[in-house]
């Protein structure tokens, strides 16, 4: 069988630990035998990020702007332990945070639903899509440890050199910590429009939540920008589509989500979206069963898995022990990127291949063949647990039957 040809490369961002192992397996077993894969490759593994002073991360984001579609493997965000383990020059920022800051846009995450895996919340009947703002807040912060006796202030210098000062805290009797966050109105507006457009495209209600009662400037600005854009640009379109936009406080939103049946988009600020997408994914089944795509205002797409690097399994793998690691989210990152590349290039064969690969993956699980995390969740009678590689080989058997 002739391989499917590509005209434009996908930006490929390799990653760390067990997901890096899975990344290569997916390409070797499920993609390269069928597709003449063209990628612009960047190694975002922590070792190489350290060697390049994180320049490789910036380069990969700029390449994504150039080509329009990227696929990213999970990467390590270093902490103090990783500083020692990898002998890092400095504690590099989150690769995702850097890429999202350059591309702007919104991260949309939705569960991959399969028969046999019932949500932990039995009332959830339909997918809940998390729309996560991809710029700023704690992911682009500045923070310091502060010595006892210090005074911390916010200082803003305008373009004419005039300073505005606001006291944060006078530290008396104890050392402490401070953190500076920021966001920009243009990015918040892009986030709002992306959410409203996605709601119209998918004909789903849109919820948005912050803590504006406490954060009367920061969070309230998010609320105000959303409301202004909705009233001026989207209200009539939403009415015509029969869908609604709904704002509430973040704690009320969590309570409503738990009681709901799903079937809507939940727009969240950056940190809220990070946390809540994990909660939604786990409650629907597994973090390994979640799609994630960053959509920029200029129509650039970056697909990734919504989970981490699966460190515990990686250490088992290094010892030569067998692992049963769920590769579905990483696989769906690849299929998402291949499908979008096909759509943009008018390459129906490539898009169709991505569809068939996803269907083969779902059929494998619904046939009872799955990794350990899904095995404990599945209520199928004929289920069996397989190892990391065998799961991909089982998918390949079903894929071949459709090609």
What do these predicted regions represent?
Residues 2-8, 18-23, 28-53, 61-64:
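N-terminal alpha-helical transmembrane segments of multi-pass membrane transport
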Residues 6-25, 154-247:
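Glycine-rich phosphate/diphosphate-binding loop of Rossmann-like nucleotide-binding domains
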Residues 34-41, 202-210, 234-247, 342-354, ...:
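Flexible, glycine/charged-enriched surface loops at secondary-structure junctions
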Residues 47-164, 177, 271, 275:
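N-terminal glycine-rich phosphate/adenylate-binding segment common to multiple enzyme folds
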Residues 49-62, 230, 234-263:
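A structured beta-alpha segment of the ubiquitous adenosine-cofactor-binding alpha/beta core
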Residues 134-135, 140-192, 199, 347, ...:
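Glycine-rich phosphate/pyrophosphate-binding loop and the adjoining helix
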Residues 257-356, 363-367:
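Glycine-rich phosphate/nucleotide-binding loop
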């Amino acid at each position: 069988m002739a391989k499917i040809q590509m005209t434009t490369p996908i930006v490929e961002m390799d990653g760390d630990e067990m997901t890096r192992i899975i990344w290569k397996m997916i390409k070797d077993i499920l993609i390269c035998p069928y597709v003449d894969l063209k990628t612009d490759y960047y190694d975002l593994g922590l070792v190489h990020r350290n060697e390049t002073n994180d320049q490789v991360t910036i380069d990969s984001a700029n390449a994504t702007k150039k080509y329009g579609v990227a696929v990213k493997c999970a990467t390590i965000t270093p902490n103090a332990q990783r500083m020692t383990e990898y002998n890092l020059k400095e504690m590099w920022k989150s690769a995702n945070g850097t890429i999202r800051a350059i591309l702007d846009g919104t991260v949309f995450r939705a569960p991959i639903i399969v028969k046999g895996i019932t949500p932990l919340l039995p009332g959830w009947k339909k997918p809940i899509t998390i729309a996560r703002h991809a710029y700023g807040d704690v992911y682009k912060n500045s923070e310091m440890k502060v010595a006892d006796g210090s005074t911390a202030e916010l200082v803003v210098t305008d373009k004419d050199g005039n300073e505005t000062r606001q006291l944060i805290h006078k530290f008396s009797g104890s050392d402490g910590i401070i953190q500076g966050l920021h966001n920009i109105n243009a990015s918040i507006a892009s986030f709002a429009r992306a959410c409203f457009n996605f709601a119209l495209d998918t004909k789903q209600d849109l919820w948005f939540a912050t803590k504006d009662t406490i954060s009367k400037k920061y969070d309230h600005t998010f609320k105000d920008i959303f409301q202004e854009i909705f009233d001026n640009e989207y209200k009539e379109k939403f009415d015509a589509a029969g869908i609604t936009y709904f704002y509430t406080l973040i704690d009320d939103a969590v309570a409503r989500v738990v009681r709901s049946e799903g079937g809507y988009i939940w727009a969240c600020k950056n940190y809220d979206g990070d946390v809540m997408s994990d909660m939604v994914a786990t409650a629907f089944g597994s973090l390994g069963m979640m799609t994630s795509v960053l959509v920029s205002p200029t129509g650039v797409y970056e697909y990734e898995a919504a989970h981490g690097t699966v460190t515990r399994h990686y250490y088992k793998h290094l010892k030569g022990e067998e692992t049963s690691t769920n590769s579905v989210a990483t696989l769906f990152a690849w299929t998402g990127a291949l499908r979008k590349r096909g759509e943009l290039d008018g390459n129906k064969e490539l898009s169709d291949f991505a569809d068939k690969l996803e269907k083969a993956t779902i059929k494998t699980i619904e046939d009872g063949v799955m990794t350990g995390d899904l095995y404990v969740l599945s209520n199928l009678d004929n289920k069996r647990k397989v190892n990391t590689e065998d799961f991909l080989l089982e998918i390949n058997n079903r894929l071949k039957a459709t090609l």
